[in-house]
A protein has these predicted regions:
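Basic, polar low-complexity surface loops/patches
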Residues: 1-168
Length: 168
C-alpha cells in the first residue's frame, strides 16, 4: 500500500564453508504490482501493474495482473490525458511505470493515490520492443496478437523487461 520495493535475498554459499559473512544475492524484487502471495493480496480484487507511454503520436497503456496473467494493451492517437486517467480509474493499478513523456504523475498520485515510477524514453525504443516481444513469444511478428502499432510496442517491452527483472 505504501509503494515500497522489497528485495528478497538468499544465501549463495554454505555458511560452514564461508569465511566471515555469508554471501547473499538478491533473487527477486517485489513491488506493489508484482505481489503474488495470496496472503498479501486482497481476495476478489485484481492486482494490476500499469505501464504508460507517451510520444508525439499519443499514449500507449499496458495493464497486467501478474497473479492471473491478464494482459491488456490499448493506445490513444491523441494526447488527451483524460483518456489515460479513465484507464487508470478503470483498473486502479497498484503500481504505474511510465516514460519521461508522462508529465502528470503528480496528478495521478493526487487523484488516485498511486505513485508512478519513471523510466528514460530510450527504455521504450521501438526496435528493442519488437525484438524483445518476438523473442519472448517466439514469433516472427506480433500481428497474431493484434499488436501492430508502434506506440504499443514500447509499453509491452518495458513491462516484459520490468517483469523479468523483478520476477525472474
Amino acid at each position: 500500500e505504501k509503494g515500497y520495493k522489497v528485495a528478497i535475498c538468499e544465501q549463495t554459499e554454505d555458511p560452514k564453508k564461508a569465511k566471515g559473512i555469508v554471501k547473499r544475492d538478491v533473487i527477486r524484487i517485489v513491488t506493489p504490482g508484482t505481489v503474488l502471495d495470496t496472503n498479501i493480496l486482497d481476495e476478489g480484487r485484481n492486482n494490476y501493474i500499469m505501464c504508460l507511454f507517451k510520444n508525439v503520436d499519443g499514449f500507449g497503456v499496458a495493464t497486467c495482473d501478474v497473479s492471473t496473467g491478464e494482459f491488456v494493451v490499448t493506445s490513444f492517437e491523441d494526447t488527451a490525458e483524460n483518456k489515460v486517467m479513465d484507464e487508470i480509474a478503470k483498473y486502479m493499478p497498484s503500481e504505474i511505470i511510465c516514460n519521461d513523456g508522462i508529465d502528470f504523475g503528480d496528478q495521478i498520485e493526487r487523484v488516485f493515490g498511486i505513485k508512478t515510477a519513471t523510466y528514460n524514453d530510450w527504455s521504450f525504443d521501438y526496435q528493442n520492443a519488437n525484438i524483445c516481444l518476438c523473442n519472448h513469444f517466439k514469433t516472427l511478428n506480433l500481428c497474431g496478437f493484434g499488436i501492430d502499432d508502434d506506440s504499443r510496442y514500447g509499453n509491452d517491452w518495458l513491462f516484459l523487461c520490468f517483469h523479468r527483472k523483478l520476477c525472474g
